[in-house]
Amino acid sequence: MAGEAASPPLKVLAAQLRAAGRGAGGTWRLSRTETGRAPLCLRAVWMQGTVLQVERGGGGSARLRDGSGHFTVLGVEDVPRGRPCLSAGKYVMVMGMVRACSPEPVLRAIKMTDLSENPVHEEMWGLEVEELHRVIP
């Protein structure tokens, strides 16, 4: 895909990503058959969830849960502002490159931010994702 502009991270829920399959050139194909639309090809995603567990060392990893399921984020100790987010119960935003989708999504972290201070972030997340996917052609 040389010469193509990189797509921004796509907001997704764990359940949506879990159903994605391998695409061409290292992309993942996010199915949208239920809406009658063509699949979306993606490499990077934006996800939000509550930190359940953190493993230190080797770049670190974290297990998170959003309203639709669980996902794992690798390299959490290597991203700017990642370490302050690394405690159970924090609600965080993660941008990352998709490494696997099944049986559970696995991301390599690019960016993490703690969103715990404002509960509106968690309350609105599912609606934000739903609205975005409704307007993407």
Swiss-Prot record:
The domain of life is Eukaryota
Q: Name one GO biological process term.
A: negative regulation of double-strand break repair via homologous recombination
Query: Transmembrane segments in this chain: where?
Result: none
One GO cellular-component annotation of the UniProt record comes to: cytosol
State if Transport is listed as a keyword: no
GO molecular function terms attached to this record: DNA binding
User: Gene3D superfamilies attached here?
Assistant: Nucleic acid-binding proteins (2.40.50.140)
Keyword entries, A-Z:
DNA replication, DNA-binding, Nucleus
Q: List the residue ranges forming a coiled coil, or say none.
A: none
Location of the DNA-binding region in this protein: 45-115
Query: Which compartment or compartments is the protein found in?
Result: Nucleus
Q: What is its main location?
A: nucleus
Q: Which family does it belong to?
A: Belongs to the RMI2 family.
Q: How does it assemble?
A: Component of the RMI complex, containing at least TOP3A, RMI1 and RMI2. The RMI complex interacts with BLM.
| Its job | Essential component of the RMI complex, a complex that plays an important role in the processing of homologous recombination intermediates. It is required to regulate sister chromatid segregation and to limit DNA crossover. Essential for the stability, localization, and function of BLM, TOP3A, and complexes containing BLM. In the RMI complex, it is required to target BLM to chromatin and stress-induced nuclear foci and mitotic phosphorylation of BLM.
Instruction: Provide the protein name.
Output: RecQ-mediated genome instability protein 2
Q: Which organism encodes this protein? A: Gallus gallus (Chicken)
